[in-house]
Regions:
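Core residues of bacterial helix-turn-helix
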Residues: 37-40, 50-52
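Beta-hairpin "wing" of winged helix-turn-helix
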Residues: 66-76, 83
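Short hydrophobic beta-strand that contains or immediately precedes a catalytic carboxylate
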Residues: 133-140, 156
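Helix-turn-helix DNA-binding motif, specifically the short coil turn and the N-cap/start of the second
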Residues: 54-57
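Short, hydrophobic-biased segments on the C-terminal half of alpha helices
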Residues: 62-63, 207
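Short capping segments at the starts of secondary-structure elements
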Residues: 28-31, 39-43
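Rhodanese-like catalytic fold shared by cysteine-dependent sulfurtransferases
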Residues: 2-6, 18-23, 36-38, 46, ...
Length: 245
């Protein structure tokens, strides 16, 4: 039978385990890597490029996150692909961000500067999306789009948007989204769209935020490309048609 003294020590030990997680999360670089992995799995080179960090530094941070079981890894040939351990890790990141937003005035300043929506405006926009009343543009890299996106969204990575904006129909309002409220890609996409004469707004929620709200998310192997509007030709290579016997 376990002694009362040992029971007490074991009860206190859980704080050490919590601190283990907290220590790993107490790094802006590791939080950045974790947020990127919430968008989809990546290898070290891809993560380093997306995070603006060196491969060596990113690898060290990922090893610490792996030791705390926040991320998992599997080998793909010569590369190692990382992903979040499970959805509870993504949820914990969202809760941490929500806590910071509720108690730190600096977060409110950042949100305003990045164009955060008011709650009522956000809900109205989500309702219009659910009713398929808008054209959705996913401004993230195509790999993130494949990992999960809003149903019906068109994959138009921000760096491709200026050359492909003509593919978007003009009949409806366009809503662009990216990685979440602290990602500037969607607001930049709206600037490009408005400059081209479109009615456009941004949604300040990313796919992990939408999943947390039980908004349907779909996956696809290939990005959906819009049909070119009248007067323009698609720059994509046409598929070979199968001959009908």
């Amino acid at each position: 039978m376990i002694s009362s003294d040992r029971r007490r020590r074991r009860a206190l030990a859980h704080y050490e385990e919590l601190a283990r997680i907290g220590k790993v999360l107490a790094s802006p670089v590791r939080l950045r890597l974790l947020d990127l992995l919430r968008q989809g799995s990546r290898n070290v080179d891809e993560l380093a490029e997306a995070a603006g960090a060196t491969v060596a530094n990113s690898s060290r941070h990922l090893q610490q996150m792996r030791s705390a079981r926040l991320v998992s890894a599997e080998r793909e040939g010569k590369n190692v692909r990382y992903r979040i351990a499970d959805e509870s890790v993504s949820a914990a990141y969202g809760l941490l961000r929500g806590l910071a937003e509720s108690i730190l005035p600096e977060m409110d300043v950042l949100r305003r500067e990045l164009g955060a929506l008011e709650a009522g405006e956000r809900e109205e926009l989500l309702g219009r999306i659910a009713r398929s009343e808008v054209t959705l543009v996913d401004a993230r890299p195509v790999e993130e789009y494949r990992a999960g996106h809003l149903p019906g969204a068109r994959s138009m990575p921000l760096d491709e948007l200026p050359g492909r904006v003509h593919e978007i129909p003009r009949e409806r309002e366009v809503v662009a989204y990216c990685r979440g409220p602290y990602c500037p890609m969607a607001t930049r996409a709206v600037e490009i769209l408005c400059a081209a004469g479109y009615r456009a707004r941004h949604l300040d929620l990313g796919v992990p935020d939408l999943r947390a709200r039980s908004v349907p998310i779909t996956k696809s192997e290939e990005p959906r490309r819009a049909k070119p509007t009248a007067g323009h030709r698609s720059r994509s290579t046409p598929r070979k048609q199968r001959k009908v016997p």
